[in-house]
Curated annotation (Swiss-Prot):
Disulfide bonds join 27-44, 40-108, 91-117. Its main location: secreted. One of its GO terms (biological process) is suppression of blood coagulation in another organism. The lineage of its organism: Eukaryota, Metazoa, Ecdysozoa, Arthropoda, Hexapoda. This is Salivary protein 15b.
């Protein structure tokens, strides 16, 4: 009887963690019925990761979070931190400028364009990048 409360609390936490979804699962489920908004899956995931904010902005906190994940998961060596942040900052500026002059302001395409810009940098290997993002996705429960 002494351990009944502890057992119940443990069961509740176990059930909660078993039902948790990753950002990938949550975002794919959210947009699977809407073909026009499938481009937003990427933005949705990046928002959960903290790489882009809800208003499609990419500022210092988002760049810091993204660069830390890439370094933590071995995509970019820590000795190239300054170079990586410069690439990310330049990409963010470029994407914002293109969005202002194009027919779209900041929208779901913004995060896709930003992702592509960062990925085409010589600092980043696409295979390691994708694996790092997938591994990071598994560490987050929503």
């Amino acid at each position: 009887m002494k351990y009944l409360g502890l057992a119940l609390i443990s069961a509740v936490f176990l059930i909660g963690t078993c039902q948790a979804e990753t950002p990938s699962q949550k975002c794919e489920e959210k947009y699977k019925e809407n073909a026009e908004r499938k481009a937003c899956i990427h933005h949705c995931k990046y928002q959960y990761y903290g790489f882009i904010d809800v208003n499609y902005n990419i500022a210092q906190p988002e760049i810091r979070k993204f660069s830390n994940v890439l370094m933590d998961y071995g995509v970019v060596d820590r000795s190239k931190k300054r170079e990586l942040k410069k690439v990310m900052h330049d990409c963010a500026k470029k994407i914002k400028k293109e969005a202002r002059t194009g027919d779209h302001w900041l929208n779901c395409r913004t995060s896709i364009d930003y992702y592509r810009c960062v990925l085409t940098s010589k600092l980043i290997g696409p295979q390691r990048f994708d694996k790092a993002i997938q591994d990071y996705d598994k560490t987050i429960s929503v």
